[in-house]
Amino acid sequence: MFKGGMGNMMKQAQQMQERMQQAQEEVANMEVTGEAGAGLVKITMLGNHNVKRVSIDPSLMEDDQEMLEDLIAAATNDAVRRVEETSKERMSEITGGMGLPPGFKMPF
C-alpha cells in the first residue's frame, strides 16, 4: 500500500515539475510594459527581464535630460515590478493546491 502511495506521490511531483517548467518558459516569453510620466515613457520588458522596447513621447525630447532619465528609470522599475507580479501570479496558479507556505521556492 505504501509503495502505491509513494509512486503516486512521485508521479504528482513529476507532473508538477513539468507544469512548473512550462510556466517558467511562458513567463520568460511574456511581455509587460512599465510606464512613467502618465505614459509618456514606456518600457516593454520580457519575463526574463530583458528590455525589448523603449518608447519616449516626442514632447519629452524638448525637456531637460535629467527629467527624461528619471522617467526612464521609473518606467524600467515599473516594468520589473510587473514582471515579478505576473511571474508570481503564474507560479501560484500552479502551486495553489499544494498548500505551500508563502515564499516557499520549489527546487526545480
Swiss-Prot record:
<protein>
    <recommendedName>
        <fullName>Nucleoid-associated protein IL1848</fullName>
    </recommendedName>
</protein>
<feature type="region of interest" description="Disordered">
    <location>
        <begin position="88"/>
        <end position="108"/>
    </location>
</feature>
<keyword id="KW-0238">DNA-binding</keyword>
<dbReference type="GO" id="GO:0043590">
    <property type="term" value="C:bacterial nucleoid"/>
</dbReference>
<feature type="compositionally biased region" description="Low complexity">
    <location>
        <begin position="9"/>
        <end position="26"/>
    </location>
</feature>
<dbReference type="GO" id="GO:0003677">
    <property type="term" value="F:DNA binding"/>
</dbReference>
<dbReference type="GO" id="GO:0005829">
    <property type="term" value="C:cytosol"/>
</dbReference>
<keyword id="KW-0963">Cytoplasm</keyword>
<comment type="subunit">
    <text>Homodimer.</text>
</comment>
<comment type="function">
    <text>Binds to DNA and alters its conformation. May be involved in regulation of gene expression, nucleoid organization and DNA protection.</text>
</comment>
<comment type="similarity">
    <text>Belongs to the YbaB/EbfC family.</text>
</comment>
<feature type="region of interest" description="Disordered">
    <location>
        <begin position="1"/>
        <end position="26"/>
    </location>
</feature>
<dbReference type="InterPro" id="IPR004401">
    <property type="entry name" value="YbaB/EbfC"/>
</dbReference>
<dbReference type="Pfam" id="PF02575">
    <property type="entry name" value="YbaB_DNA_bd"/>
</dbReference>
<dbReference type="InterPro" id="IPR036894">
    <property type="entry name" value="YbaB-like_sf"/>
</dbReference>
